[in-house]
Structures are given as C-alpha cells and as structure tokens.
Design a protein with these regions (language model features):
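Acidic, low-complexity cytosolic segments
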Residues: 1-30, 37-159
C-alpha cells in the first residue's frame, strides 16, 4: 500500500463539498473518506448514529479482506463491497490505491442508486487526492504503521 498524501485545507474543503453533494443527491446518511489502513480522513452526514472512527477501521479491514478473496479467484480487483441490513446498508467503493468511500444509507434506497451517485464523487475525490500527491510527493503520510494510541508521534515536530 502506498502513502496517503498530505491534504491542505482547500483539499478538505473540496472533499467536504463533494461528500455533502453526494449525501444531498443520494439521500444517504453518512459518507466517509477512509484510508485503506483504516484511518478516517473525513466524514459528512449524521455521525451521531455510529462511532465513525471504529466504522472506518472495520470497513477498511472488511474491504481489504474482500480484495484478498478476489486474488484467490484470480480477480484483480473488486471495486466495491455492499452489505445490506434490516434498516441500513453500506457501500464501500474503491477510490484509489490508498482510499475508500464508505456510504451508510437506509435500506429503502437501492445499491444501484448509491453506485450511480457515488461514481462522480469517487472521480472528484480521486482527482483531488492525485493533485495533492503531485503537489508534494515527499509530504505523504504512511498511516499503515501508525500507532493510533500514540498521538504524540503524529504531531511531533520534525527538525
């Protein structure tokens, strides 16, 4: 897995606008931008319903497991993963090698409509992440080995 790029405020603002538009058009409840190592990058919607940090980690792990399953059947990539519940469903869509879009929506909405509205959002977010990567390739963050209990290491000043 590669490194997630350092995002600037304008990147976050654009991602926020894209996720809000996705929620408005699709009528989904929550949209999460998740780094594939399991870290929540950004969220929009009604996060009071769930612990989005834990949800991001579990969603990433589930998606990564499905990707491993894909390799076992000689499939190069499963681009999305759908889980249907009694009240809510989730759709996880691959954005790029480092990130996922996770959408939580009521079951009366169809997965097809979620995929339809997610597609332009995924393209916009992928483009912005790519721009951020090009802007500062040496400023990327490798979150895969980060210890989430050691917050000091994340914010330690580099000399």
């Amino acid at each position: 897995m590669g490194q997630f790029p350092q995002l600037q405020q304008e990147d976050i603002d654009l991602i926020d606008a894209v996720l809000r538009e996705l929620l408005r058009k699709s009528e989904a409840n929550i949209a999460l931008l998740v780094e594939k190592a399991g870290y929540l990058i950004h969220q929009c919607g009604n996060p009071e319903q769930i612990d989005t940090t834990t949800f991001a980690t579990l969603g990433s792990n589930a998606y990564n497991a499905v990707q491993f399953m894909a390799s076992l059947v000689n499939e190069s990539n499963f681009s999305s993963m759908y889980q249907q519940g009694e009240s809510y469903s989730t759709l996880m869509v691959n954005i790029d090698e480092n990130s996922l879009l996770v959408i939580v929506f009521p079951t009366h909405l169809t997965v097809g409509s979620m995929k339809y509205y997610a597609a332009p959002a995924v393209r916009s977010i992928a483009e912005r992440i790519n721009e951020a990567s090009q802007r500062g390739p040496g400023a990327a963050l490798d979150l895969s080995d980060l210890d989430p209990t050691d917050v000091q290491a994340l914010f330690h000043r580099k000399d």
